Amino acid sequence: MTLRVTNTLTGEKEPFEPRDPDSVLLYYCGLTTSDPPHLGHARGWVHVDVMARWLDYLGYDVHHVENLTDVNEKIVARVGEDGDSEADVARHYVQQAIDDMRSLNLGRAEVYPRVSEHVPEIIDLVERLIEQGHAYEQNGSVYFDVTSFEDYGKLSNQSVDDIESQGADTEGEKRHPADFALWKAGGVDPADIAEHQHPEAAPAEEACQTAQIWDSPWGEGRPGWHIECSAMSMTHLDESIDIHVGGQDLVFPHHENEVAQSEAATGKQFANYWLHVRLLETEEEKMSSSLGNYFTVADAVEEFGPDVLRTFLLSTAYTSRATYSDETIAEAKERWDRLSRGYERAVEACDDVDAHTKVTDETLRDAVEDARSAFEAALNDDFNTREAMTALLDLTAAVNTHVDGHDEYDYQGLRRAVETFEEFGGGILGLAFGDDDSGDVSLAGDVVDLVLTVRQQEREAGNYERADELRDELEALGVEVQDTDDGPTYRL
């Protein structure tokens, strides 16, 4: 069965056909590192994790990139509360995000690029747009001219005339109200962070003095929001990719503007498939940091554990409405208890019987193969994790029926059931069945980070030969190291 996905660009569920039949380029718009990650972020993380795992299962070489936005006015608003500068606050929440991802048993993306590490690439992309007549400079800021891109609005299904404005234009710098900033002159204005500040934060003027700024052909300034993802996706994947995933709230303006600036610069379709994860809701509204109605990932993992949370988040398809409540989390706990107990009973029954037993239960064996087929059909149907979970629950019921109804067990049938729990429940859904190795991948990433820290210390101490040796040893293990002005990055 061919994988089909719901493509926001076309509004249709359509067959997935990658540019390269052997590989998939997947980009996920990650979070802004200004607050503790919450369950709304976790919903996106876990669904993209399953997408990547399933594409890998289908035989593709998956190149998965997920950005972490570490330059933003909301981050500046937290100065004095979670760090002494914008960069400090960002580092604090970047680390928390990585820790939270690990706690949810996420497979590691190939790279987690930060905006602060890609300013030269951003400037290069802005210059290309100016040279091609798609952008213009005004008083040190650079804006994208939406009227220069004929297909503007194709992702969100609206026209330029439908859009009244994008961002403030107090200086009257824009040619069209819908034009958006690619580069912002100067630093951060205290007025821009006032609504995001907490009482514990530093005074606005003091916080803004810590904001990161960079030199550019147009003077000192900061990147615009939308240009960042285009530059990072092109840097780490290609000018045209297969799948771009993000939250439903990003369709407009963020993803619409990504399409416009990327395709205007390259003349190529930026992403062939746009997949959008519906937001997690609580009491009829989205869960978000700005609304203050969120449950942090760290608190949720501590209270419920990663398997209950993954079960909760995957019990609803990524395109469907999902609601957090005491009732829905209790349902997830009951569902996980059934799944884990079914797996344990299958393992225990296998241990109690001779592998060469002649007992055959065709009902069990048929149920196992039916569950496998149903699971595969579900994931091939737009990564439908709800139906995939149902297939595993049906498998659990079949195992219970067999164990409860027989004095002698069908070893081969039970062994196949155990393999299915581990391969599909563990390897694809990321639940704790058997030996899922994604935790090993996360640990490997932590070890690489540690080695790079030591290598950077050696370089700063002038021990360049030893630093080069560490780099060579990493590359011999398949870790590509790239040195940038903001420190080393790597990809596995």
From Swiss-Prot:
A motif ('HIGH' region) lies at residues 31-41. GO terms for cellular component: cytoplasm. A motif ('KMSKS' region) lies at residues 286-290. The keyword Acetylation does not apply. Its cofactor is Zn(2+). It catalyses: tRNA(Cys) + L-cysteine + ATP = L-cysteinyl-tRNA(Cys) + AMP + diphosphate. Binds 1 zinc ion per subunit. HAMAP family: Cys_tRNA_synth (MF_00041). This is Cysteine--tRNA ligase. It comes from Haloarcula marismortui (strain ATCC 43049 / DSM 3752 / JCM 8966 / VKM B-1809) (Halobacterium marismortui). The lineage of its organism: Archaea, Methanobacteriati, Methanobacteriota, Stenosarchaea group, Halobacteria. The gene is cysS.
